[in-house]
Amino acid sequence: MEHIFLNLKRFDIPSSLGGVNSIAPPAKWAEYIISSVKGELAAMSADAEFTIFFPEAHIIEAAAAGKEGWLLGCQGVHRFDVAPGGNFGAFTTGRTAKSMAALGCDYTIIGHCEERRDLGEIISEGGGTDLNAVNRILNQEVLRAREAGLK
């Protein structure tokens, strides 16, 4: 079976704000994407597994559209997660793997170039020089994703 991944990055930002979106209002963007491709994806589903990775603002809308012929992916997860008797979930700006799984995600992206660059810049800004720390942090994300059942 083939695996096809579509990462939509931040293509939802309207062109009037400097983005590239001219196809639908941001609140209806995921719905537009899915309605535009789901017929073709259903026809291909016997030969290929197709995953669409949406920006976090569109995960709920995408999951609600119904995953017929496609899987849902998020664009990253935090290196820590909630646990019974542990952290109760105060991850204000972080997407935990369990939260993404609970919303219906099947896959996540870990270690894309923007994330690697951002982590490296944070380490350097703090005076650090061990950029292998980026790989160690990303490994924590991989572990959290697997624990949550994400691929």
Protein language model regions, located:
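Conserved N-terminal beta1-alpha1 strand-loop-helix module at the mouth
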Residues: 1-74, 79-85
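Short, acidic/polar
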Residues: 25-31, 88-102
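Active-site glycine- and acidic-residue-rich loops that bind
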Residues: 49-53, 81-82, 89, 127-136
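Conserved, mostly hydrophobic/aromatic
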Residues: 55, 100, 112
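Short amphipathic alpha-helices and their capping/turn segments at secondary-structure boundaries
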Residues: 60-64, 95-103, 141-145
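Receiver (REC) domain switch/active-site residues of two-component response regulators
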Residues: 106
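Conserved anion-binding
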Residues: 114-151
